[in-house]
């Protein structure tokens, strides 16, 4: 699933394309269940003739602001991705929704596994109001993080994956942040001392910023993996220290990386650097 760096990269790609200001002349819906709200009929009516004013991000959600003050909120889930092309570009059978613009450009939403969801609403808080703070904003201070962690008995990895606690972190960047901080994923959050809490705070920011600079993580070939708007790969997969590195030597101590299951997720750790 695309995490904060991947979604950030997609949003930047969309902003830098010719998309902003484009007027939607028609919409084609090939998989109606992609639309969470409203119905396909109402959706097509409400976006018809509207232009895309801005594209932004909140956590793992992409937010398109339309000229009628409506907001299209998209969650990519496992395999959702966008392609901004001309009408002459051959379409794959995995396009679920397509916007057609007045000059022949098209915005296509590909989703192999059909888990992605679109929401068209007038109030973004209806969909994203439950989300926790953004870890890369200046308002996400260590003092705030320390206060958030107090009295939390939840296992560390499970807590960091909780989007109502903090947004944008998923399996990749949690594993990488915990390795950077030398923390075991099964430690209860309230048992981390102040020194290691500060290290974790900076590690979260570091791995996310590194992921953004590398334009995200593409874990393999094929349509089920993350790709940028132009179809190119991210580069962060070449910089991973532990994620999907089972059996490889730890870059820090040389011990072999191990895999365990935490919160029903494959989790990768160095058992020497990250002792429980």
From Swiss-Prot:
Name assigned to this protein: Formamidopyrimidine-DNA glycosylase
Function: Involved in base excision repair of DNA damaged by oxidation or by mutagenic agents. Acts as a DNA glycosylase that recognizes and removes damaged bases. Has a preference for oxidized purines, such as 7,8-dihydro-8-oxoguanine (8-oxoG). Has AP (apurinic/apyrimidinic) lyase activity and introduces nicks in the DNA strand. Cleaves the DNA backbone by beta-delta elimination to generate a single-strand break at the site of the removed base with both 3'- and 5'-phosphates.
Gene Ontology molecular function: 8-oxo-7,8-dihydroguanine DNA N-glycosylase activity; class I DNA-(apurinic or apyrimidinic site) endonuclease activity; damaged DNA binding; zinc ion binding
Cofactor binding summary note: Binds 1 zinc ion per subunit.
UniProt KW keywords: DNA damage, DNA repair, DNA-binding, Glycosidase, Hydrolase, Lyase, Metal-binding, Multifunctional enzyme, Zinc, Zinc-finger
CDD domains per record: EcFpg-like_N (cd08966)
Keyword DNA damage: yes
Cofactor(s) named in the record: Zn(2+)
Enzyme Commission number(s) from the entry: 3.2.2.23, 4.2.99.18
Keyword Disulfide bond set for record: no
Single Gene Ontology BP annotation: base-excision repair
Subunit organization: Monomer.
Positions of DNA binding: 113, 152
High-level lineage: Bacteria, Pseudomonadati, Chlamydiota, Chlamydiia, Parachlamydiales
Superkingdom: Bacteria
Pfam hit, one: zf-FPG_IleRS
Database matches in SUPFAM superfamilies: Glucocorticoid receptor-like (DNA-binding domain) (SSF57716), N-terminal domain of MutM-like DNA repair proteins (SSF81624), S13-like H2TH domain (SSF46946)
Gene3D superfamilies: 1.10.8.50, MutM-like, N-terminal (3.20.190.10)
Active-site residue list: 2-3, 60, 265
UniProt similarity note: Belongs to the FPG family.
Zinc finger (FPG-type) residue numbers: 241-275
SMART domains: Fapy_DNA_glyco, H2TH
Catalysed reactions listed for this entry: Hydrolysis of DNA containing ring-opened 7-methylguanine residues, releasing 2,6-diamino-4-hydroxy-5-(N-methyl)formamidopyrimidine; 2'-deoxyribonucleotide-(2'-deoxyribose 5'-phosphate)-2'-deoxyribonucleotide-DNA = a 3'-end 2'-deoxyribonucleotide-(2,3-dehydro-2,3-deoxyribose 5'-phosphate)-DNA + a 5'-end 5'-phospho-2'-deoxyribonucleoside-DNA + H(+)
